[in-house]
A protein has these predicted regions:
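Acidic, gly/ser/pro-rich intrinsically disordered tails
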Residues: 1-10, 154-172
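OB-fold ssDNA-binding interfaces and closely related basic DNA-contact patches used
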Residues: 1-90
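Beta-strand/loop nucleic-acid-binding surfaces
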Residues: 79-111
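Exposed beta-sheet edge/beta-hairpin loop segments within beta-rich domains
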Residues: 98-124, 131-142
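OB-fold/S1-family single-stranded nucleic acid-binding modules
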Residues: 129, 136-156
Length: 172
């Protein structure tokens, strides 16, 4: 994984997006979001020095402690997925979210991004824009996705057998 900064944005290449309760692209109600509507995901920061530098820069990097002996603690960052309201702001920049599979690419929008909740994401490239949520302390940043290219491994063993069919149930 490689993390760099361009114009205040984080560029993350080869990220590991955490599965299960660490992602909620659909915005469904859950333990931490009982009313629903909040979309998010978390990715691992595999270099402790990079994680510390991000913390120093104001990013809200968390540490997941080891639960059992032999487990390794890891650092991660929560990233919000907020689609723009074009009625309120017609000049807003749309999000670029795409799911790359062996048979091509699917662009995802507000209605389809939930497909990533259950997908086996092997890696992702992410552009994250900061939002300074504390006006008194502009170093405190929340992370919002601007671009997400998720590389997905299909789970259906026979899916490639049906690529030639026009109405392929495995091609979204």
């Amino acid at each position: 994984m490689n993390i760099s900064t361009i114009d205040g944005r984080l560029i993350v290449e080869g990220a590991q997006i955490l599965p299960g309760t660490f992602r909620n692209f659909s915005g469904a109600p859950d333990q931490f979001n009982p009313g629903g509507g909040k979309r998010y995901f978390h990715f691992v920061i595999d270099d402790p020095e990079v994680a510390q530098q991000m913390r120093n820069d104001g990013w809200n990097v968390k540490i997941k402690p080891a639960r059992e002996e032999g487990d390794i603690p890891f650092c991660y960052l929560k990233v919000a997925v907020a689609f723009p309201n074009f009625q309120k702001n017609p000049k807003a920049r749309p999000l670029d979210i795409a799911m790359f599979k062996s048979n091509g690419v699917n662009r995802l929008d507000e209605t389809t991004v939930g497909l990533l909740d259950g997908a086996y994401i092997t890696q992702a490239n992410i552009t994250i824009r900061p939002y300074c949520w504390d006006q008194a302390d502009p170093s405190k940043k929340a992370a919002y996705v601007q671009e997400l290219h998720a590389f997905v491994q299909e789970s259906a063993h026979f899916a490639s057998d049906y690529d030639e069919f026009e109405e392929n149930p495995f091609n979204d």
